[in-house]
């Protein structure tokens, strides 16, 4: 599915429970979309933007409470409106993350719709983070990974996390048992041939020692 270029800034009016509430000055004032997401070119499925902050030693409840829903997009136009109105990755403070998840699932390992899946995880140079994040977003909502997964699997989300020396990106899938049939990494390398990825690996959620903790992991 080819996506048109970003249109001029259109603002959507999010429903009350979709608004992002930030109390951190370093993120600045978020320009919220202003108009209902009812028109435009529909996406194959809705996708939800999330924001959170990951801190070492926090409890499961604290991890989930740090998770903020930004907006659920249903069209290409609403995707661009949200993308253009949230801070760029380069403006996020250390240990903050963006996620885009299929439907309204949360970026939590133990979420029922995620629990049997896993992530491809890789480090990227900070100067490449914004480009990598944008390209992965477009590939994800454009369903460019569909034929790179097993028939009984799909990509269900992407994440970018700001870290000290290098940032981290993750691509989530729903069925870790068939990951051997996937060529998702090859597609990522095709999309971003000039990016130097490091520490690239796949890990099922259930193999994490803290899997039962119910935390957001990135």
Curated annotation (Swiss-Prot):
It holds the Pfam family IF4E. Recognizes and binds the 7-methylguanosine-containing mRNA cap during an early step in the initiation of protein synthesis. eIF4F is a multi-subunit complex, the composition of which varies with external and internal environmental conditions. It is composed of at least eIF4A, eIF4E and eIF4G. This is Eukaryotic translation initiation factor 4E type 3. InterPro entries: TIF_eIF4e-like (IPR023398), TIF_eIF_4E (IPR001040). Keywords: Initiation factor, Protein biosynthesis, RNA-binding, Translation regulation. One of its GO terms (biological process) is regulation of translation. Belongs to the eukaryotic initiation factor 4E family. MRNA binds at residues 109-110, 163-168. Residues 1-20 are annotated as: Disordered. It comes from Xenopus tropicalis. Coiled coil: none annotated.
């Amino acid at each position: 599915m080819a996506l048109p270029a970003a249109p001029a800034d259109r603002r959507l009016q999010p429903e009350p429970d979709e608004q992002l509430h930030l109390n951190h000055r370093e993120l600045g004032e978020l320009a919220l979309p202003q108009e209902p997401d009812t028109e435009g070119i529909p996406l194959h499925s809705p996708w939800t933007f999330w924001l959170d902050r990951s801190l070492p030693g926090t409890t499961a409840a604290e991890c989930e409470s740090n998770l903020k829903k930004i907006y659920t997009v249903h069209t290409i136009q609403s995707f661009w409106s949200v993308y253009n109105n949230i801070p760029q990755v380069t403006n996020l403070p250390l240990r903050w993350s963006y996620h885009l998840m299929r439907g309204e699932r949360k970026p939590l390992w133990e979420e029922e719709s995620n629990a049997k899946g896993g992530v491809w995880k890789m480090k990227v140079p900070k100067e490449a983070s914004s480009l990598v994040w944008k390209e992965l977003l477009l590939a994800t909502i454009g369903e460019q990974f569909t034929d790179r997964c097993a028939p009984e699997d799909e990509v269900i989300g992407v994440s970018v996390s700001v870290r000290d020396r290098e940032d981290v990106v993750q691509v989530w899938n729903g069925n870790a048992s068939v990951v051997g049939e996937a060529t998702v990494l090859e597609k990522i390398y095709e999309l971003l041939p000039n990016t130097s990825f490091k520490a690239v690996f796949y890990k099922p959620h259930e193999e994490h020692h803290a899997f039962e903790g119910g935390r957001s992991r990135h």
